[in-house]
């Protein structure tokens, strides 16, 4: 089949080489955007008097037929035509004849593909933003139901201080809020039209780039045509933001994987988000959480791949940029699905509140409470720290915990200790009293929840 750019060539191409150079297997995802861009472009050509209105009407009608066929799944693409742009132009030619050739006036595939990608990413990011907003709602609802659920707080994966489970959930709420802000703020750099930049230097035709941008719903146009077709920083920014978002999902998934284990038993995931073993009948595996954790590396890889593709490219377009799409498509799908799966896991998981709280009674996470107690009695904190550290060592040697130590022994250690120490050492008291702003105290959590709700 004759190629649309074949005038300069004499030799015939070979199918296996065509297959290597073709991108239609993946860039056909942008068929909708490519047709939308062409409709805006032909409208602009007509408005500016570059092509007659009658021909513009023919082209427009043909493009709308292709839109209908696309919606019905009736468009067939070929690797002979390389990419989505040439495939659609060929299909348009089959619909309306030679006038289809006028569509490409004052346009290059360089600005055409950049336009498609801006349109595609803009819509897809909007959908991710909605899913992220839903996840934040789920976290707030789960936190609101668990304000007084006590759990161990960890450092180094060792019991550190008791906290409210709601406090833990709201920590992730803060992280996902920043993820949301990053994505929302990045939209203004996606929402820019490169259409009309042509190959790299603009065009000799009297086009109206602002008009085509307006038709496509863009809020701005690239001020420099070379910039418009050369860079993919808007994709890199999305991949970077996605990597941070997936990192947050992965960290929480790691905790869910630990918490569902027999050693923790803090939470139980519903059957829908779990799988079994082909040999061990008792197994209930947190596969969805593990997959999100695993897919995080995949998203990182897409970011590094894109950075590597671009790092040595001179301006303007180079065929290397064909490699800018699959990583973007894959990341969009991965992030979208991961968010939806994760929200479902959090929304439906069972919290074993008694086991969570009991675990805070079988450790020394209340040691800080004893040190603070002594400090409030006038003992310098460093001295109090030393006293409590030695007592913890003594307790571990005797197989008991701080709440098991007799009052008489406490008073031997320091006569300032009174019988109110046992209230101080309770997990609930330890949590309740941490009422500094942003702390885990119940009153502070209620404030945090109200503040969070205002941002939903």
UniProtKB/Swiss-Prot annotation:
GO terms for cellular component: cytosol. GO terms for biological process: arginine biosynthetic process via ornithine; L-arginine biosynthetic process. Pathway: Amino-acid biosynthesis; L-arginine biosynthesis; L-arginine from L-ornithine and carbamoyl phosphate: step 3/3. GO terms for molecular function: argininosuccinate lyase activity. InterPro entries: Arg_succ_lyase_C, Argininosuccinate_lyase, Fumarase/histidase_N, Fumarate_lyase_CS, Fumarate_lyase_fam, Fumarate_lyase_N, L-Aspartase-like. The keyword Amino-acid biosynthesis applies. PROSITE patterns: FUMARATE_LYASES. Keywords: Amino-acid biosynthesis, Arginine biosynthesis, Cytoplasm, Lyase. Its main location: cytoplasm. Gene3D superfamilies: Fumarase/aspartase (C-terminal domain) (1.10.40.30), Fumarase/aspartase (Central domain) (1.20.200.10), Fumarase/aspartase (N-terminal domain) (1.10.275.10). Transmembrane segments: none annotated. It is found in: Cytoplasm. The keyword Ion transport does not apply. Its EC number is 4.3.2.1. Belongs to the lyase 1 family. Argininosuccinate lyase subfamily. PANTHER family: ARGININOSUCCINATE LYASE. This is Argininosuccinate lyase.
């Amino acid at each position: 089949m004759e190629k649309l750019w074949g005038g300069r060539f004499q030799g015939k191409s070979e199918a296996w080489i065509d297959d290597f150079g073709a991108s239609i297997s993946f860039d056909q995802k942008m068929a909708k955007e490519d047709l939308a861009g062409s409709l805006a472009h032909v409208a602009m050509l007509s408005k500016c008097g570059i092509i007659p209105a009658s021909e513009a009407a023919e082209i427009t009608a043909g493009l709308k037929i292709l839109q209908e066929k696309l919606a019905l799944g009736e468009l067939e693409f070929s690797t002979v035509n390389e990419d989505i742009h040439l495939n659609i132009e060929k299909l348009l030619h089959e619909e309306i004849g030679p006038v289809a050739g006028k569509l490409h006036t004052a346009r290059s595939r360089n600005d055409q593909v950049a336009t498609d990608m801006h349109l595609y990413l803009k819509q897809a990011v909007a959908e991710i933003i909605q899913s992220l907003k839903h996840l934040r709602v789920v976290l707030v609802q789960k936190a609101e139901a668990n304000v007084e659920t006590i759990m161990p707080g960890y450092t180094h994966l060792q019991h550190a201080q008791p906290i409210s489970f709601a406090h833990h959930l709201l920590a992730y709420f803060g992280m996902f809020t920043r993820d949301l802000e990053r994505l929302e703020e990045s939209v203004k750099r996606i929402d820019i039209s490169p259409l009309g930049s042509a190959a790299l230097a603009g065009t000799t035709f009297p086009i109206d780039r602002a008009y085509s941008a307006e038709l496509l719903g863009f809020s701005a146009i690239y001020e420099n045509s070379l910039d418009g077709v050369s860079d993919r920083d808007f994709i890199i920014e999305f991949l970077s933001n996605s990597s941070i978002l997936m990192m947050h999902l992965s960290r929480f998934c790691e905790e869910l994987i630990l918490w569902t284990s027999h050693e923790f038993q803090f939470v139980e995931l519903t059957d829908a988000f779990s799988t079994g073993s082909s040999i061990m009948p008792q197994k209930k595996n947190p596969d969805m959480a593990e997959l999100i954790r695993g897919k995080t590396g995949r998203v990182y890889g897409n970011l590094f791949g894109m950075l590597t593709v671009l790092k040595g490219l001179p301006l303007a377009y180079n065929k290397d940029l064909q490699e800018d799409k699959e990583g973007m498509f894959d990341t969009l799908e991965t992030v979208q699905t991961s968010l939806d799966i994760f929200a479902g896991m959090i929304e439906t998981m069972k919290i074993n509140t008694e086991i969570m709280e009991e675990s805070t009674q079988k450790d020394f996470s209340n040691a800080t409470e004893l040190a603070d107690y002594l400090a409030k009695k006038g003992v310098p904190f460093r001295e109090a720290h030393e006293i409590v550290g030695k007592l913890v060592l003594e307790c571990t040697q005797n197989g008991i915990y701080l709440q098991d130590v007799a009052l008489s022994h406490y008073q031997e250690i320091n006569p300032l200790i009174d019988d109110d120490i046992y209230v101080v050492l309770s997990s609930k008291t330890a949590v309740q009293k941490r009422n500094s702003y942003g702390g885990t105290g119940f009153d502070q959590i209620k404030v945090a929840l109200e503040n969070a709700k205002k941002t939903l």
